[in-house]
Amino acid sequence: MRRNIILKAPAKVNLTLDVKGKRSDGYHELETVMHQVNLLDIIIISQAAGGIQIKSNSSLIPTNEENLAYQAAEMILGEYAHKEGVEIYIEKNIPVGAGLAGGSTDAAAVILGINQLYDLGLEEEELLEMAASIGSDVAFCLAGGSKLARGRGEILSKLPQRMIPYIILVKPDFQLSTAEVYRELDLTQVEEFPDNAAFLAAWEAYDIINIARNMRNVLETVSIRKYPEIAAIKAELIETGALNALMSGSGPSVMGIFMEEEQALKAREKFQTRYQEVFLLSSYV
């Protein structure tokens, strides 16, 4: 009987994102706090005689080697189980091109899933190394939880797990290219850089007010210039009661942190009149 395995693939938000400069390899040197939230893709991986096949409920994602999940399957099978194949079904719930690591989290789930499905017995360190070679966010998505990420995003330091109970996430009706945003980033134009030390102190103390107050993302400089609507969403989230609002990753998704469920529900209702993709989320634990 053919075995299959079902995994949850949580979205990622960046609670702070600083860029220290451009590296000799063309990547940017980052320092960012990444945090998983309970917006989930569902990944079903089934044994197959050979090859890799991807199907999805979404027409917005590729089902060939352009998909990071395909690349992840190709890498782990090629390295450790070259005679085996897989069929992968991606139930896509995370918005595409949104700064939420939707493709990366699917790839991480595929690495974990194939390791289990074919009893490969690979240790976390080996899986993380593989994940990092596929994409900058894939290692975090595999490790999960809350992490301070440096380098390209693959050098991870564990943070205490903290629950953020009410997050309103608004995905505007357009996409942004991560590569394009980084290409256009000019650090001399950034008006305010994150104080990651202050953020981490607030995180350690589980001080939600100062966690929110210290959220910053230098990539907003580029994304807001291209799409001023991002700044308008941020301002409106704060007007509706958010402690602070921030673009996640390279955008365009914007999240607001709320203390009270009632305020968060009202904000969701307000934004749902204008946007198709509005979510009330909390930390994924």
Curated annotation (Swiss-Prot):
InterPro entries: GHMP_kinase_C_dom (IPR013750), GHMP_kinase_C_sf (IPR036554), GHMP_kinase_N_dom (IPR006204), IspE (IPR004424), Ribosomal_Su5_D2-typ_SF (IPR020568), Ribsml_uS5_D2-typ_fold_subgr (IPR014721). It comes from Syntrophomonas wolfei subsp. wolfei (strain DSM 2245B / Goettingen). Transmembrane segments: none annotated. One of its GO terms (molecular function) is 4-(cytidine 5'-diphospho)-2-C-methyl-D-erythritol kinase activity. This is 4-diphosphocytidyl-2-C-methyl-D-erythritol kinase. Pathway: Isoprenoid biosynthesis; isopentenyl diphosphate biosynthesis via DXP pathway; isopentenyl diphosphate from 1-deoxy-D-xylulose 5-phosphate: step 3/6. Keywords: ATP-binding, Isoprene biosynthesis, Kinase, Nucleotide-binding, Transferase. It catalyses: 4-CDP-2-C-methyl-D-erythritol + ATP = 4-CDP-2-C-methyl-D-erythritol 2-phosphate + ADP + H(+). SUPFAM superfamilies: GHMP Kinase, C-terminal domain, Ribosomal protein S5 domain 2-like. The lineage of its organism: Bacteria, Bacillati, Bacillota, Clostridia, Eubacteriales.
